[in-house]
């Protein structure tokens, strides 16, 4: 399976980079993992709703340009479907079983994802009703993907 994470913004925090590198290394035994970053837009402090939508559209255009046409796209969004780690593992296994060899997870910027990106998504996933920094979501997502592969292979993993 080839898994890509397409995300808005460049990581700067060393602790996040270290964690992402660790999980990318661990996952290399199970799948090919790519992390693709697209430029984020500066959001004015008191941006209007229209300005925020325009920013999401510009970021969304960059995200869509990085998604292969034959990929199964999972958008991370608060309004997405919540799953347990076991359900998420079963879903990844199901995608592999049905020949979905390219899976792309999309993480938006601080304003979220554009309507165009949400329309392109084959499904949406939520990790919580809480809001997390989009940079941190990359690490959380990688950990859950790693956990899913361990669950699917019957390998021990900390609960």
UniProtKB/Swiss-Prot annotation:
EC number(s) on file: 2.1.1.177
Keyword line: Cytoplasm, Methyltransferase, rRNA processing, S-adenosyl-L-methionine, Transferase
One GO term describing the cellular component: cytoplasm
Top-level taxon of origin: Bacteria
Residues where S-adenosyl-L-methionine binds: 76, 108, 127-132
Pfam families named in the record: SPOUT_MTase (PF02590)
GO molecular function: rRNA (pseudouridine-N3-)-methyltransferase activity
Catalysed transformations (reactions): pseudouridine(1915) in 23S rRNA + S-adenosyl-L-methionine = N(3)-methylpseudouridine(1915) in 23S rRNA + S-adenosyl-L-homocysteine + H(+)
Top-level enzyme category: transferase
Compartments, record wording: Cytoplasm
Family designation: Belongs to the RNA methyltransferase RlmH family.
Assembly description: Homodimer.
NCBIfam families: PRK00103.1-3, tRNA_RlmH_YbeA
Function summary: Specifically methylates the pseudouridine at position 1915 (m3Psi1915) in 23S rRNA.
Protein name: Ribosomal RNA large subunit methyltransferase H
């Amino acid at each position: 399976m080839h898994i890509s994470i397409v995300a808005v913004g460049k990581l700067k925090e060393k602790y996040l980079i270290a964690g992402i590198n660790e999980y990318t290394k661990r996952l290399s035994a199970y799948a090919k993992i790519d992390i693709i970053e697209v430029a984020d837009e500066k959001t004015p402090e008191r941006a209007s709703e229209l300005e925020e939508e325009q920013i999401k559209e510009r970021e969304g255009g960059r995200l869509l340009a990085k998604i292969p046409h034959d990929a199964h796209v999972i958008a991370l969004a608060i309004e997405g479907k919540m799953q347990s780690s076991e359900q998420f593992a079963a879903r990844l296994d199901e995608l592999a079983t049905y020949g979905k060899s390219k899976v792309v997870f999309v993480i938006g910027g601080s304003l979220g994802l554009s309507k165009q990106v949400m329309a392109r998504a084959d499904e949406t996933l939520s990790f919580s009703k809480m809001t997390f920094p989009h940079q941190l979501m990359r690490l959380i997502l990688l950990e859950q993907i790693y956990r899913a592969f361990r669950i699917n292979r019957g390998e021990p993993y900390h609960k």
